[in-house]
């Protein structure tokens, strides 16, 4: 399962995350902001990856940095606790999923980021 996700095109997965948030009344910009915050990419670099032939796994492997607050991003995604995932790459991917879930539940990107920045 992991390798299949890692090999998927970044654009396909990322656009699905955006669609999930937009279906619930959220905005694509919120997804861009939380992705940028988590991975260290500038928003413009995240958007540029949509037009490049980059895999989802490579997007995360090549992230400029991960914020220290990411360890505070815990909980379940697809029935699995993020903090119990052994594969560090999959952990980072699932952390973004968790942030996107908050956005899909009606939180703004500012509310989501403030929640985790309190753990500095």
Predicted regions and their residues:
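A charge-rich, low-complexity, intrinsically flexible signal that marks solvent-exposed coils, linkers
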Residues: 1-120
């Amino acid at each position: 399962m992991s390798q299949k996700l890692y090999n998927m095109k970044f654009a396909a997965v990322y656009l699905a995350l955006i669609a999930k948030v937009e279906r619930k009344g959220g905005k694509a910009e919120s997804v861009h902001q939380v992705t940028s915050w988590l991975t260290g990419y500038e928003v413009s670099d995240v958007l540029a990856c949509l037009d490049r032939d980059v895999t989802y796994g490579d997007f995360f492997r090549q992230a400029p940095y991960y914020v220290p607050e990411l360890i505070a991003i815990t909980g379940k995604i697809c029935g699995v606790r993020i903090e119990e995932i052994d594969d560090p790459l999959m952990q980072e991917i699932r952390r973004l999923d968790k942030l996107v879930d908050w956005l899909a539940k009606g939180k703004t990107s500012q509310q989501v980021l403030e929640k985790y920045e309190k753990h500095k």
